[in-house]
Structures are given as C-alpha cells and as structure tokens.
C-alpha cells in the first residue's frame, strides 16, 4: 500500500498535491515534505472591509508558526489573498458541515453573528478566541474578548476607546499588534489597462459613496464636485470611484466638475482601479479599506465613528466636520441633517495637499 503523510502542508486528500503534479514525487521519499506546525481557523464572515482589516493576523501567525496551515471562512472569498492563505472557504452548508468535524490547534471567530458564534462553539480546537454562542447570543469565549465585546454594547465605552481595530482583534487572540499591514491582491496579473487615466499627473481618487447602512457618513455630491474642481485647477488627475450604487451620483459629479469617471466594475477590477491612484479621498467605506490594503495615501472623512478605530499606517490624515457629531454609530442623523455638510471643501483640499507631500 502506498504511504502518505497525512500531516503534510501540501496534501489535499482528494486530488494529487502540487509537488506530485509538478515533479512526480511520492510521499515515501518526498524531498519537500513539510509537516504542518499548527492548524489555524479564522472565521470572519462579514463586510468586505472588515475582512480586509483582519488580514494582518495572517502575517503574525506565519511568523509565529512557520509552516502553519491557515483556513479562512468568509462570505467573500474573492477579497482574500489566495497566495497567503492555504484554504479559503465560502460560508455555506458544505463548509459549515466540514468545519464542525475538522480539528484545529487554534480557532478564532471575530464576528458576533449567531451563525459564526455557533460554528466556533461546534469546532474542535485546542484554543478558541473571539465569540461563541452562549444562552442563544454571541458572547466572549474568554476574558480576552471582553474589551471588544463591551465596545459593541455600550456607546460611552466605545467612544472612550483608544485602541484601533487591529489592536483590538489582536488582543482578542492573545497577541500584540505591531503594525502588520493589510494583505490585499492588487490584481495586476489580470491584464487590466486604463488608457483613459493621465499618468503624467498625480492621480487623486474620490470615493464618493458610503453604502446604505450608514448614510450619515455621506459627503454631499456638490462638495465632491467642488473638491474635484480645486484639484483639477491644481493640475491633478481626478478620478471618481464607486460601484453601481454610485453610478448616477458619479455621473452628476463628473458633469459638475469635469472629473474623470470610467464607470463601475467587478470587485477585482475596481481594486486594480484604486491601485492606479496615488491618494484616495474617502468616507469610512469598503473603499477606505481597499485603499489602505493597497498601501495608498488617504484622506479619510469621518464623523460618526471613533477616529481611534482607524490605523492609516502613517500614510494619511483623518478630517472631521467643524461641529461635533451627535450621531455616534447612527445610520440616520437624529437632527435631520448630517454634520458632513459642516466639513468644508477647503478643509479636505488642504488635507490632500498635506498628505500628498508625505
């Protein structure tokens, strides 16, 4: 009977491994046999931006445990860097069934959704971190998750928080965040070309939308148009960014300002479009996380979130309205009009000039 290494990092179990396909190796005398040092499961299902800003954990675990095998469960597999993660699973019935019977050394759930917490409860692991299902709700699996959990329950605790998101999730896992970067594929290998971008100029991207959930974040389109005009007058190439939801808005801003708008694209192509920019002006959105993941300069407009939450990695600046926001983590302004109208174009423009000079 043919011998095989069940603990080898390359072994798939259902198909031939890469060393066999490329070199014909068999397990008995395989020169590249690599014993798995740790099996690690990360459950991070939710919003694309939150998935991106959880990726610094990968580098830390790779450094701690060379030859570890990392499995990641998510709703959006396409956003994860395939070359950095051994097994990427989309959250569905098949993946949930598999994981309930798999075994790990470390299992982490960073989502408070009940299905994610229930899965961590069911997973077999020597160490568990984050949230599990207790009394039919998501609760901390241990005291390490208490801080992050409490910031999600009490607004005053969240407003007093001085830790950024990565510091919080690292602490949940018993780790210390040391500025590890986001990991994101720029999709440069896909052959995307952008002939309509003037590369002789510094390219400033304006990410104009903010999604449906937190509309209090939205900067008025007239303000974006005014900023675009000032940047164009200064000699920058101004590129409007957004998805299908922002298409009509971006067309209007283009018509008002003369900024460049190329349309909306599938996610990998949109990521590559952002990669063409030197700096991006954005609200707190997926586009913000993509910008940081691509290591671009950034001017971040924020009103309803604790600014301590965001690590810009020394490549940007946060600008806020001139009056205090009273709608902390609210999707709609309780005063009837968002304070983003109190964030003047001149303030954002001056921040762009400072950051581009970094």
Kindly give the residue locations of the regions a language model identified.
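Catalytic machinery of carbohydrate-active enzymes
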Residues: 1-358
């Amino acid at each position: 009977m043919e011998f095989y290494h069940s603990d080898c990092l390359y072994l798939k179990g259902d198909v031939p491994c890469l060393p066999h396909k490329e070199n014909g190796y068999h397990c008995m005398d395989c020169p590249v046999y690599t014993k798995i040092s740790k099996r690690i499961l990360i459950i991070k299902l939710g919003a694309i931006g939150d998935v991106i800003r959880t990726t610094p954990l990968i580098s830390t675990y790779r450094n701690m445990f060379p030859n570890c095998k990392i499995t990641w469960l998510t709703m959006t597999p396409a956003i994860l860097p395939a070359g950095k993660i051994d097994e990427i699973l989309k959250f569905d019935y098949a993946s949930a069934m598999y994981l309930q019977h798999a075994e790990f050394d470390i299992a982490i759930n960073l989502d408070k959704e009940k299905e994610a917490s229930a899965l961590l409860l069911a997973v077999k692991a020597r160490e568990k971190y984050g949230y599990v299902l207790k009394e039919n709700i998501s609760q901390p699996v241990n005291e390490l998750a208490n801080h992050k959990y409490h910031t999600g329950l009490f607004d005053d605790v969240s407003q007093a928080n001085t830790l950024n998101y990565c510091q919080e999730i690292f602490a949940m896992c018993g780790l210390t965040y040391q500025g590890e970067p986001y990991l994101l594929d720029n999709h440069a290998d896909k052959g995307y070309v952008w002939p309509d971008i003037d590369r002789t100029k510094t390219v400033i991207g304006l990410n104009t939308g903010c999604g449906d959930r937190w509309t209090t974040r939205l900067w008025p389109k007239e303000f974006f148009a005014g900023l675009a005009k000032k940047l164009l007058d200064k000699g920058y190439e101004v590129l409007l960014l957004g998805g299908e939801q922002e298409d009509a808005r971006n067309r209007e801003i283009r018509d008002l300002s003369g900024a460049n708008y190329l349309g909306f694209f599938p996610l990998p192509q949109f990521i590559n479009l952002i990669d063409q920019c030197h700096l991006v002006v954005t609200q707190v959105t997926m586009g913000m996380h993509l910008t940081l993941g691509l290591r671009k300069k950034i001017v971040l407009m924020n009103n309803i979130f604790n600014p301590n939450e965001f690590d810009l990695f020394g490549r940007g600046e946060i600008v806020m309205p001139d009056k205090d926001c009273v709608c902390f983590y609210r999707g709609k302004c309780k005063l009837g009009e968002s304070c983003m109208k109190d964030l003047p174009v001149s303030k954002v423009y001056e921040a762009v000039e400072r950051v581009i000079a970094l």
